[in-house]
From Swiss-Prot:
UniProt-listed InterPro entries: Ribosomal_uS11, Ribosomal_uS11_bac-type, Ribosomal_uS11_CS, Ribosomal_uS11_sf
Keyword field contains Ribonucleoprotein: yes
Organism: Methylibium petroleiphilum (strain ATCC BAA-1232 / LMG 22953 / PM1)
GO biological process, one term: translation
Stated name of the protein: Small ribosomal subunit protein uS11
Gene name of the record: rpsK
Gene Ontology terms, MF aspect: rRNA binding; structural constituent of ribosome
NCBIfam families: PRK05309.1, uS11_bact
Amino acid sequence: MAKAPNTAAQRVRKKVRKNVSDGVAHVHASFNNTIITITDRQGNALAWASSGGQGFKGSRKSTPFAAQVAAEVAGRAAQDQGIKNLEVEIKGPGPGRESSVRALAALGIRIVSISDVTPVPHNGCRPQKRRRI
């Protein structure tokens, strides 16, 4: 006889609540989207959210408000994991840089430091052509 097929309910992993008080918020702010990932000090992801994942599509993804909403969602999920203090690392030139940090601070999470880790080329690849609007 054949075995009974595995159902999806048997394979679902239960989220384990980690008690981590300090973490790092990685804000990737591109021109098209903003992604916020909150990790512990070792780099293990605790929570993440993006402005596209919050229901914003197209050009609305690249707004400061969309980044604020995504930061609030990621921040609440990180608080559920026990996060109280965050170091913020911002990467990219997008419009969601500042509003995402403000949203994390408004949740009551203590911002320890803010650093810009945007990669800057030492005369590497040729940049894209200038936009003419």
